[in-house]
Regions:
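Conserved acidic segment of CheY-like receiver
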Residues: 2-12, 18
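Conserved sequence signature across two-component system core domains
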Residues: 8-9, 32, 50
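Charged docking surfaces used in two-component/phosphorelay signaling
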Residues: 16-24
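Helix N-cap/capping motif at the beta->alpha junctions
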Residues: 31-40, 61
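Active-site residues of response regulator receiver
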Residues: 53
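Receiver (REC) domain active-site loop signature in two-component systems and cognate sites
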Residues: 56
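Hydrophobic/aromatic residues positioned on beta-strands within the core alpha/beta folds
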Residues: 75-77
Length: 116
């Protein structure tokens, strides 16, 4: 069965680029522009993985993630300390922390590992 991924990022270029990359890998990909948009689409889309930027306008990500029942991997453009990463990874459904800018091959490798 084909896995579905939701990309949640307020940057249209990031959403578009990651969507194209993952679709070429055979995944079904849907997008959301922020946490609120993500929450409104979750019931309908039922993704196997949510790739979510940690810095977006709207409801803070730390309040959105607990409402997501599926696996979540954070995408971060900001430099974060190990303590900050540990804090972000506290939610039981958070499975990875991917630093932006990311290497395309590494992103694909991480996604495949998470969804294996």
């Amino acid at each position: 069965m084909t896995k579905k991924i939701m990309i949640v990022d307020d940057e249209p270029d990031i959403r578009s680029t990651v969507k194209t990359i993952l679709e070429k890998e055979g995944y079904v990909v849907v997008t959301a522009e922020n946490g609120d948009d993500c929450l409104s689409k979750l019931d309908k889309e039922k993704p196997d993985l949510v790739l979510m930027d940690i810095m977006m306008p709207g409801t803070p990500v730390r309040l959105v993630v607990p409402k997501i029942k599926t696996k979540v991997a954070y995408l971060s453009v900001v430099r974060t300390t190990e303590a900050e990463k540990d804090n972000l990874l506290q939610s039981k459904n958070v499975v990875a922390f991917i630093q932006k800018p990311f290497d395309i091959k590494e992103l694909v490798r991480q996604v495949k590992k998470i969804l294996a």
